[in-house]
Amino acid sequence: MDDNRTNEVKDDYGDGFYVDDNTVSSRSYVAEEPEEQGSNRRIRIKKRKSFISRLLTVLVIIVVIMLSSVMAVVGVILMRINYTNEMPDHNVAENQGITLMSKNGVQNIMVFGEDKHEEGYHGRSDAMILITIDSNNNKLKQTSFLRDLYLFIPGYGYDKLNAAYAYGGPALSVETIEYNFHIKIDDYIIIDFNSFTDIVDSLGGLDMNLTYEEVEYIDWQSYRNKQTDSEKELNADNYSYELNDDGDYVTKIHLNGRQALWYARNRDSAGSDFDRAWRQRMVIDTVLSKLKSADPFRLSAVGISVSPYVTTNMSPAAVTGKAASLIGALNWDREQYRVPQRDNYYDQWTDNAGLALVITDEDKARVELTEFIFGE
């Protein structure tokens, strides 16, 4: 009987005692003190839960605001980019029986640097660099194609590579590289050189190792183009130079955007297209290093500043995806390559293009380039 009654009543206090209203015992008296403590405990628990709930709400609001801000910045950047319907025709090579090499996990984006011209007119690209995002090996790769390469341009015959850009813009340039080297290029980006100064300035400038002649070249171009009143803005005589591993005497100098652009375009001091391509790769590598350590606010500033100078064949959604891939790849190993290699070309005077770089062994050039882009 007692057992049944005990099972029917509630444990009002959560203390293991079962007391009903009709029962008075020593245990009901003992339970009076825990009742007050239990009530206080429940109040404290409610207050703690209320605080946690409010804290979580605040955190959620902060996250939503941050995400909204990020999306707003991304939206602004995407709206400021220029989009083109000039699409490369990959069939140009494939119709000639050429199989274009591609691989899952490897994205190839061709970057063209040009001076701004009137709408509908393409000048000759001063820089042609293939950016490869290799997620199979966690590597970010750069390949420079020298503009004086003497190649077959589909529909035009043999000419310098940068002539393809003048004849048919980025689409024909991509088709030319695919035709001659048998690699598939997924997308392309055109960057107006005017944006380069904004990129570098937004990042706070670049520290580069320069020779005496390179410093003098920057000063000379800056002065002759009336970008400074001083003939020796940097003044090569103010620095001490140390021998580096390449056998050159160099000094580290902080360059602003304008000065870094002259450095990247220099083909006079050290004197060849090979040297200029090397400088361009070094500048890009330094910019990537700066982007890697930049905070989100600076990255946003760079994106907003540069986007009006960018033209691409990608859709806004594709730009977002490629940008995310590139940002993720900033922490990967970076490698560089150049076409042609120094042991696989010769200089030749041509009737239509003047002095040009002719590849000695085309099959070797294709194999080595394919191995660099798609191999480990």
Model features per residue range: what roles?
Residues 1-45:
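N-terminal targeting leaders characterized by basic, low-complexity, disordered sequences
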Residues 2-3, 8, 45-138, 258, ...:
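Entry/capping segment at the start of metal-dependent catalytic domains
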Residues 94-98, 111-118, 124-129, 163-178, ...:
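N-terminal post-signal-peptidase region of extra-cytosolic proteins
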Residues 104-107, 123-128, 137-145, 156-158, ...:
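Extracytoplasmic
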Residues 116-120, 159-167, 182-187, 266-275, ...:
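Second-shell loop/turn segments in exported
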Residues 121-125, 155-156, 164-172, 190-194, ...:
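Soluble non-cytosolic domains of exported or imported proteins
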Residues 201-298, 375:
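Flexible, polar/acidic helix-loop-strand segments at domain edges
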